[in-house]
């Protein structure tokens, strides 16, 4: 039977696009998979309400065999990225597929054709929908369940991409801290000493994120984020509107003691945000729907969370060479032990970011998961 590729143009097709993972991920075969919240997937795809699409566009495709969906993909034109990097890279994301090379090839071809029509010369991904959101294809660490806002896929997915001609662009790492280890403290003495020296002569303090002043706190974190990540591979600045949109979700799940800002002489210098791993709660929902019982299950499971993801750790450029990383880790160690949590993941960290990778390893963390961003060259028409 041949594969048919159709563009997603109707509400019915969109439902089939969103529902597809439940067809692919057998819960017995893939117990690590965490069903996403359907409302979150719908938001990430919504070109009318999601501010990301003010400077981006996308086209969704479904792969059908005998009329039944066997794969999906989004082709994404990210003009914000292109303007910042002065390149013609196009993107793909939200990729899911049965172990069917013909279907995968057809999906990539459809996305590439759409991007080529928009003068893109490379197709890169997966991005869901950008590096400021969920991204990367898991290539190592399949045995662990994914932390919140990270991706998981079956082990055959990398084979589908590589057989289709995709090659490595960059790897992203996750480190695991066993906070329950004896002794629980993992900060080497030299980092403690560096942290103490960094404090000397500086009016530096850490304070909890103030959820009652949420709009202004988002403004501060947005400025730090765009400054701290500016030179990272694949980064492009988030608009204030997009940052606020994404932060609205975090407002309801972060613990202010584990989302804190560093101030120097009263000015925001950096921030660290650890997100409780609600994926444990998402698993109890199963079907990805908050109603009629999902919300209750989510709130009930919240009390049992004992792990988190270090999602944001950044400082403005003028403070990066003054021991502020050691100060953040010293403060994190003190706060994390208050709650009796047992696990912490730090992700994503670029494979060549030695400024973070080396201290992670020094502190006894182990690399336990790795994602890959893939590229494939395409033949875009010359710009007119």
Question: What is the meaning of each model-derived region?
Answer:
Residues 76-80, 283-284, 304, 313, ...:
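Alpha-helical subdomain
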Residues 83-165, 285-363:
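Acyl-donor binding region in acyl/amide transferases
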